[in-house]
Amino acid sequence: MIQRESRLVVADNSGAKEVLVINILGGSTGFYANIGDIVIVTVKKAISSGAIKAGDVLKAVIVRTKYGLRRKDGSYIKFDENAVVIIKDDLTPRGTRIFGSIARELREKKFTKIISLAQEVL
């Protein structure tokens, strides 16, 4: 469960390394966001040679959470970290690679480009 002021790891090669959530858009509830929800973030740590700089305000989609997600078959999926992928306004990723595994629930939420770039889909 991600809320405002949560710090998240960035799972792509856009140049940002760590972000802070400042708002939740279209979340399942008003206060918490889960896998597949879009959040507004500000960049806290970035690499110096990247296109994204510290302080930039961007949109991102949550791809991994420690809290986990209950699937329709009754199983749960949990990850070791909370992670996001930086996206553009047309919901395509800004980076060209996505690191780590992501949940297949993103396919149901129409993030097919992120699914195709991911190393592993669980």
From Swiss-Prot:
Entry keyword set: Ribonucleoprotein, Ribosomal protein, RNA-binding, rRNA-binding
GO molecular function, one term: structural constituent of ribosome
Superkingdom of origin: Bacteria
Keyword presence, Ribosomal protein: yes
Ranges in a coiled coil: none
InterPro entries, sorted: Ribosomal_uL14, Ribosomal_uL14_bac-type, Ribosomal_uL14_CS, Ribosomal_uL14_sf
A cellular component term, taken from the record's GO annotations: cytosolic large ribosomal subunit
Entry similarity comment: Belongs to the universal ribosomal protein uL14 family.
Subunit structure: Part of the 50S ribosomal subunit. Forms a cluster with proteins L3 and L19. In the 70S ribosome, L14 and L19 interact and together make contacts with the 16S rRNA in bridges B5 and B8.
Protein name as annotated: Large ribosomal subunit protein uL14
Taxonomic placement: Bacteria, Bacillati, Mycoplasmatota, Mollicutes, Acholeplasmatales
Gene: rplN
